[in-house]
A protein has these predicted regions:
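Short amphipathic alpha-helical segments at helix boundaries and their inter-helical linkers
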Residues: 60-77, 184-191
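Short, functionally critical alpha-helical segments immediately adjacent to catalytic or ligand/cofactor-binding
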Residues: 47-67, 79-85, 89, 141, ...
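N-terminal low-complexity, intrinsically disordered targeting/assembly segments enriched
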Residues: 24-25, 50
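N-terminal carbohydrate-binding/catalytic regions of secreted carbohydrate-active enzymes
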Residues: 20-21, 39, 52
């Protein structure tokens, strides 16, 4: 299905507590320098813009491959560059495999780290050490985002695109941040998205939209795609930076 992802940078205000534009720019430069090759591959295989993958890495971990919800280096279920939870990642990969959505390159990279599938489409459990591997963490994080986008663009799920085939990035960010999607492969209910229903037929003003989310989700969205946020920087100041 063809769709466009809107990346608005106007109408949102930066949270007072977040770093300066200069500091965030340096973080993005470091992420692209250190992991640009992996981001480029993940982008090509998942069809998710490299800028979006990079921004997720920035928001989730600041580019620290050992970042953990319980402290750097600890073996928390949520760990690594894109902070996905290994407790549900096995089922995520098995769904992709059974649906024949894993590309040859994705399978090769997974196999490189010992993640293969048996005749029934089953694979091994994902470990803490797997999450610390930058290439693998970025690839799997992008696969999770790809599944989420597929769900959000399915007209049979009640999350259909609007008439302009516009995929709202706020939805992707909110569901990924909440960790609701990966557990089941299904988006639960709109009422659970930031605590309020989200209008799927009208693209609201983003200030009004983000104002309806809880503070954690609001700050996450602001940092990702607000004024002076990661996507603002990546699509302007760093738009010519080369990945890989």
């Amino acid at each position: 299905m063809a769709y466009r992802i809107e990346i608005p940078v106007n109408g949102l205000q930066a949270p007072a507590s977040r770093g300066s534009r200069k500091a965030l720019t340096e973080t993005m430069k470091r992420i692209i320098t250190n992991y640009g090759k992996f981001i480029k591959t993940a982008s090509e295989e998942s069809n998710i813009p490299a800028s979006i993958i990079t921004a997720f890495i920035g928001v989730e971990s600041g580019g620290n491959p050992l970042a953990s919800a319980s402290g750097t280096g600890t073996c928390h279920p949520t760990l690594g560059l894109m902070q996905w939870n290994r407790s549900y990642t096995r089922s995520t990969l098995e769904r992709e495999y059974k649906a024949n959505r894993l590309t040859d390159v994705e399978r090769q990279i997974l196999a490189k780290y010992g993640i293969t599938f048996d005749k029934n489409g089953k694979t091994r459990n994902i470990t803490c050490n797997d999450q610390k591997i930058a290439e693998l963490n970025i690839l799997i994080g992008s696969i999770i985002l790809g599944q989420l986008i597929s769900e959000l663009t399915s007209k049979s799920k009640g999350w259909a695109l609007d008439d302009n085939e516009l995929l709202r990035l706020d939805k992707i960010i909110s569901v990924y941040n909440a960790g609701m999607f990966g557990k089941t492969g299904k988006i639960a209910t709109e009422s659970k998205l930031g605590g309020v229903p989200v209008d799927t037929t009208t693209v609201k003003k983003y200030r009004d939209l983000v104002g309806s989310f809880n503070n954690t989700t609001k700050n996450y969205i602001d940092l990702m795609m607000g004024k002076d946020g990661y996507l603002d920087i990546l699509t302007s100041d760093l738009k010519d930076m080369i990945y890989g």
